[in-house]
């Protein structure tokens, strides 16, 4: 049975954002509305193998508060894969927290894999332990038995760190 856990629902920086004094951020700082981590989702078909959609910089905190995503024994993880929907820092920076030699599959478009491979920091996510699977747009891919995803292009801009690249 399909199950999803909303790990975080806030925009980049979370709520409150460190550099924002808007009403919502001030209310969250004062404890009047709940704070929220950055957007991410975990999905499963069986409750034992999970795929994370986007690895936010808050991923460690998100995993800590969700017992279904806790290790079941020493040096273990129920995370079978991470699917990146784009190359935004808010969606890839959490990969650095998942670098501790636990195997999982990293799903993304070929372009996003190339961007990550060109970044020396991302070499910490060892490709011999974390195989990369390139996904073509508009083509279904099986993430877990019984669970497929189809990535598709949406309008928008490239991540800030990629602006000006050709």
Model features per residue range: what roles?
Residues 1-166:
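Binuclear metal-dependent hydrolase catalytic cores
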């Amino acid at each position: 049975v399909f199950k999803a856990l909303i790990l975080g629902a806030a925009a980049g920086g979370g709520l409150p954002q460190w550099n924002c004094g808007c009403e919502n951020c001030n209310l969250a700082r004062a404890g009047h509305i709940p704070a929220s981590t950055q957007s991410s989702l975990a999905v499963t078909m069986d409750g034992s193998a999970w795929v994370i959609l986007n690895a936010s910089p808050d991923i460690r905190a998100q995993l800590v508060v969700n017992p279904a995503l806790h290790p079941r024994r020493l040096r273990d993880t129920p995370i079978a894969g991470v699917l990146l929907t784009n190359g935004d820092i808010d969606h890839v920076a959490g990969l650095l927290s998942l670098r501790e030699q636990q195997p999982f599959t990293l799903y993304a478009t070929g372009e996003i894999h190339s961007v990550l491979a060109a970044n020396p920091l991302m070499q910490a996510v060892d490709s011999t332990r974390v195989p990369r699977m390139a996904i073509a747009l508009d083509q279904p891919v099986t993430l877990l038995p019984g669970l497929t995803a189809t990535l598709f292009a949406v309008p928008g801009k490239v991540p800030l760190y990629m602006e000006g690249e050709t």
